[in-house]
Amino acid sequence: MKSTMTGIVERIPKPWGHEMIFARTNKYVGKILVIEKGHRLSLQLHRRKHESLMVLRGRLKLQLGKKTKTVGPGTAFTIAPKTIHRFEAPKGRVTLIEVSTPELWDVVRLQDDYGRRGK
């Protein structure tokens, strides 16, 4: 793989905010997630995808397995495959950075506020 500086970021609208993919290779993906106030992502798990994230701005309500806590900027966490999880921005916009394995298709939704099903 060669080094590049394209300046191209893929912005993907989501019902809860948006994602910006800044790196996509066969080994990893880098994203910025912006969750708007009062919104949350699906209660979900990944069969193969492994992700590490850090809160950049805002206060994130983080559910990992059966535990839920609120975390702020500078908090980093890792989500192993098969871990049930959810992110929520109850009091204001939240910005996260995520680096993961490349299986972006690997989403099993267990509950979704926006009516999305399955993958």
State each model region's role.
Residues 48-61, 65:
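Glycine- and acidic-residue-biased ligand/ion/polar-headgroup-sensing regions
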Residues 29-48:
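Conserved short histidine dyad/triad with adjacent acidic residue
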Residues 7-13, 86-119:
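Double-stranded beta-helix
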Residues 30, 42, 62-64, 98:
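Short hydrophobic/aromatic-rich beta-strand segments that constitute the beta-sheet cores
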Residues 65-84:
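Short acidic-glycine-tyrosine-enriched beta hairpin
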